[in-house]
């Protein structure tokens, strides 16, 4: 890859216009063939490949020629045939060609991304999952509307080719890409008119398609969002910084008070903030309801005009932050804004100000959690614990471990929220449901189960000390964490109720638009 990058730096116009010769570089397919042998691009067992097999570059050239002839399609997106000894070598060549095609297409994309990020240092720092939590803490208090937008992941192959055409001017290099995309669309795994861009299969080709598609979506949208903000110099802080204070004071209105002090309210122009995790994104907006409707309309119109793609209206949902349950990336919680009063002194008490802003205060949504537990058959609609009948065929240890895992995940999930006392009601429901499940399995009562297994068995699984077993904190830090918020970056992977809750919300929104 370094050689290809040097090739692009020597002559940028040549790199953009003549990518097709890179398809015939032997080193390129040697690298891709090594990736395939390492098992990074195929799930087939490697014992069927003999170490004495020679990799023929002439065969690769023939396959490249077959790609351009759509009547002679090669197998790129299906596994080996029932006879792996006869067809696995053919699959290795197909995987190598697909890997080589991806390596070539990554050259202009990586160079363009590098130059774009170098020119936007502030954008580079917000490309990590760890930026989600500062976004919640810093941007939500200054917003009153939240838009939950889902990136369209089903797109026609020709639209993808046209987006590549804006970056790659070499038309011959786009012919193999077009053929590969159409072949994937017509494969038995994807019998539909459009293709799924979301990388459900962890291959280099699908990851590249998804990254490029998201990059194109956000590169234009991000510039539009920046243009919509007229006060970019004013940072969202509890009080304005002293640096360039003469510029920031233009956005502040001073009210007189009886005690001759001055109270400052941070009054800003409409502000739009954007964050994305996976295929879902959140747009936090400070403005009126009309501004939110316009932002939603422009977002749908942008996708329709730029990508020639009709996006369903329910894929961009807006609601008021203080009245609804917010579905942040990986989190769903209720938010309460508490007024925060801060008094500052500047320049030897020549400027005394009282700053009033909002403090982000997430609340544990007990009622939605109870609804999810009822949906998963841990309790009824009134919150009364019931036995989990589908788990009665498991062993006692498996049942205890599953209930214990759900409780610990829920507790860690909402460790960044205040008002966690309601979580112990959830703990009571889960522990009693666990006892009823064991009693149903052994065809006895809860009292008999506790007597036979011992009360310490439930205390071990649902003990309060285990709430912090996954955190590398001391006892003092564990006690302090009861008063402080702790955000976990691996929450989207460990909470089993996020996807279920999100599906319920999506169905409700779709039903509203269908009416």
Curated annotation (Swiss-Prot):
InterPro entries registered for this protein in UniProt: Domain_X, Maturase_MatK, Maturase_MatK_N
Chief location bin: plastid
Keyword line: Chloroplast, mRNA processing, Plastid, RNA-binding, tRNA processing
Compartments where found: Plastid, Chloroplast
UniProt KW RNA-binding keyword: yes
Keyword Transferase (UniProt): no
PANTHER family (alphabetical): MATURASE K
Protein function: Usually encoded in the trnK tRNA gene intron. Probably assists in splicing its own and other chloroplast group II introns.
Family affiliation: Belongs to the intron maturase 2 family. MatK subfamily.
Stated name of the protein: Maturase K
Protein source organism: Pinus koraiensis (Korean pine)
């Amino acid at each position: 890859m370094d050689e290809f990058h040097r090739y692009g730096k020597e002559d940028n116009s040549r790199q953009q216009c003549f990518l097709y010769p890179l398809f015939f570089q032997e080193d390129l397919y040697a690298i891709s063939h090594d990736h395939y042998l390492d098992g990074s691009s195929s799930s087939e067992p490697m014992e069927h490949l003999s170490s004495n097999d020679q990799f023929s570059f002439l065969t690769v050239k023939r396959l490249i020629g077959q790609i351009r002839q759509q009547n002679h399609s090669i197998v790129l997106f299906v596994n080996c045939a029932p006879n792996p000894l006869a067809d696995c070598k053919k699959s290795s060549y197909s995987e190598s060609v697909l890997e080589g095609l991806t390596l070539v297409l990554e050259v202009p994309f990586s160079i363009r991304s590098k130059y774009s990020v170098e020119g936007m240092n502030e954008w580079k720092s917000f490309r990590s999952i760890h930026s989600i939590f500062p976004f919640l803490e810093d941007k939500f208090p200054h917003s009153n509307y939240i838009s939950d937008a889902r990136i369209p992941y089903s797109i026609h192959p020709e639209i993808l080719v046209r987006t590549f055409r804006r970056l790659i001017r070499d038309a011959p290099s786009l012919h193999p890409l077009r053929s590969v995309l159409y072949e994937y669309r017509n494969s038995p795994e994807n019998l539909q008119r459009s293709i799924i861009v979301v990388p459900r299969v962890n291959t280099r080709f699908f990851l590249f398609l998804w990254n490029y598609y998201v990059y194109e979506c956000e590169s234009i949208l991000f510039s539009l969002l920046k243009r919509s903000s007229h006060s970019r110099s004013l940072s969202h802080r509890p009080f304005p910084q002293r640096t360039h204070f003469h510029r920031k004071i233009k956005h502040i209105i001073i009210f007189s008070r009886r005690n001759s002090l001055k109270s400052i309210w941070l009054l800003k122009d409409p502000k739009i903030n954007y964050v994305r995790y996976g295929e879902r994104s959140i747009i936090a907006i400070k403005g009126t309801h009309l501004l939110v409707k316009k932002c939603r309309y422009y977002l749908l119109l942008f996708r329709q005009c730029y990508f020639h793609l009709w996006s369903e209206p329910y894929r961009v949902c807006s609601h008021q932050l203080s009245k609804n349950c917010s579905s942040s990336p990986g989190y769903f919680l209720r938010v309460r804004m508490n007024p925060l009063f801060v008094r500052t002194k500047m320049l030897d008490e020549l400027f005394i100000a009282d700053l009033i802003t909002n403090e982000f205060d997430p609340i544990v949504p007990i009622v939605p959690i109870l609804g999810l537990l009822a949906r998963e058959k841990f309790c009824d609609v009134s919150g009364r614990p019931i036995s989990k009948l589908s788990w009665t065929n498991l062993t006692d240890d498996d049942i205890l471990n599953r209930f214990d895992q759900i409780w610990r995940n829920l507790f860690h999930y909402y460790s960044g929220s205040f008002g966690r006392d309601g979580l112990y009601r959830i703990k009571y429901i889960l522990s009693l449901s666990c006892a009823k499940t064991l009693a149903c399995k052994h065809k006895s009562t809860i009292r008999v189960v506790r007597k036979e297994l011992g009360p310490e068995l439930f205390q071990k699984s649902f003990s309060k000390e285990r709430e912090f077993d996954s955190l590398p904190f001391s006892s003092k830090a564990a006690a302090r964490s009861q008063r402080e918020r702790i955000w976990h970056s691996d929450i989207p992977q460990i909470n089993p109720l996020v996807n279920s809750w999100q599906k319920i919300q999506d169905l409700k929104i779709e039903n509203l638009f269908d009416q």
